[in-house]
From Swiss-Prot:
PROSITE patterns: COMPLEX1_20K. It comes from Parasynechococcus marenigrum (strain WH8102). It comes from the Bacteria. This is NAD(P)H-quinone oxidoreductase subunit K. GO terms for molecular function: 4 iron, 4 sulfur cluster binding; iron ion binding; NADH dehydrogenase (ubiquinone) activity; quinone binding.
Length: 246
C-alpha cells in the first residue's frame, strides 16, 4: 500500500489548491518596452489593406454561381474582410468569373481603369484564363483576360469550387503583405493600364544548335568553341550513319 504522504500526492494537492483558488489580477507594468509595438510603415500599410479587400464581382458565366455560394453562411465570406462593392471606384479587387467576349472587353477595361490604385485582379475559371471550351470554335471569345488587363492570380477550374476561391484570396493576401511602398515607382503605364516594368537582361545562349549542323558528332566536337566541354564517350564519338539535316 502506497504512502499517502508521498511527494507526488502532496504536489497534486498543492496544484489542486492553487487551481481552485481565485485568479489574481495581473500586474500592470509601466515599463515602456512592454507597452510599445515596433513595426514598419510597410507592414502597417499592408496589414490594413490585406484585411479589408473590397472586391468588384464581374460574373459573366457559370463560374459566378460558385462565387455566389460564398455569400451564404456555410462558407462565411465575410471572415476575410471582403466587402462586395457595386462600384469600381470603391473596389480594389476585380474578380473576373466567366467568358469574356469581344463585345464585353471594352467594358471590362473601363471598369479596371476606374478602380483606384493599388488594385488587383483574380481570373476565375478556365474560360477567363484561356477562353475555355469557347476558344476552340468561337470567334468572339477572348483567349485570356490577361490580354486586356494585368492579372495577379489565376484560379483554374470549370468551375472552381468555393474552397479554391478562399485559397486564391489567401494567396493574394500574402502577395499584398510582401509589397513595399518604395516599389510603387516601378509601376509605369504600358498600353492602357499600369503594370510592373520588367527589366529583362539578355543572357548568352546555351544551346547554339551546332550539333545539328555538323555531319557527325566528331565534327561537332571539333567545331566546339574553346572552353566548352562535350561528352567524349564511345557512343558520342561514333560517326552517324545518316547525315543530320541542317
Amino acid at each position: 500500500m502506497s504512502d499517502l504522504t508521498s511527494p507526488s500526492i502532496t504536489a497534486v494537492r498543492d496544484l489542486r489548491e492553487a487551481s481552485c483558488g481565485p485568479i489574481g489580477a495581473p500586474a500592470v507594468t509601466s515599463d515602456l518596452s512592454e507597452n510599445v509595438i515596433l513595426t514598419s510603415l510597410d507592414d502597417l500599410h499592408n496589414w490594413a489593406r490585406l484585411s479589408s479587400l473590397w472586391p468588384l464581382l464581374y460574373g459573366t458565366a457559370c463560374c459566378f454561381i460558385e462565387f455566389a455560394a460564398l455569400l451564404g453562411s456555410r462558407f462565411d465570406f465575410d471572415r476575410f474582410g471582403l466587402v462586395p462593392r457595386s462600384s469600381p471606384r470603391q473596389a480594389d479587387l476585380l474578380i473576373v468569373a466567366g467568358t469574356v467576349t469581344m463585345k464585353m472587353a471594352p467594358a471590362l477595361v473601363r471598369l479596371y481603369e476606374q478602380m483606384p490604385e493599388p488594385k488587383y485582379v483574380i481570373a476565375m475559371g478556365a474560360c477567363t484564363i484561356t477562353g475555355g471550351m469557347f476558344s476552340a470554335d468561337s470567334t468572339t471569345a477572348v483567349r485570356g483576360v490577361d490580354k486586356l488587363i494585368p492579372v495577379d492570380l489565376y484560379m483554374p477550374g470549370c468551375p472552381p469550387r468555393p474552397e479554391a476561391i478562399f485559397d486564391a484570396v489567401i494567396k493574394l493576401r500574402k502577395k499584398v503583405g510582401d509589397e513595399s511602398l518604395a516599389e510603387r515607382r516601378k509601376h509605369v503605364q504600358t498600353h492602357r493600364y499600369f503594370t510592373v516594368s520588367h527589366q529583362m537582361k539578355r543572357v548568352e545562349e546555351q544551346v547554339t544548335g551546332s550539333y545539328l549542323r555538323a555531319e557527325t558528332q566528331k565534327a561537332a566536337l571539333a567545331a566546339a568553341p574553346a572552353g566548352q566541354t562535350l561528352a567524349t564517350d564511345a557512343a558520342v564519338l561514333t560517326p552517324a550513319l545518316e547525315a543530320v539535316e541542317s
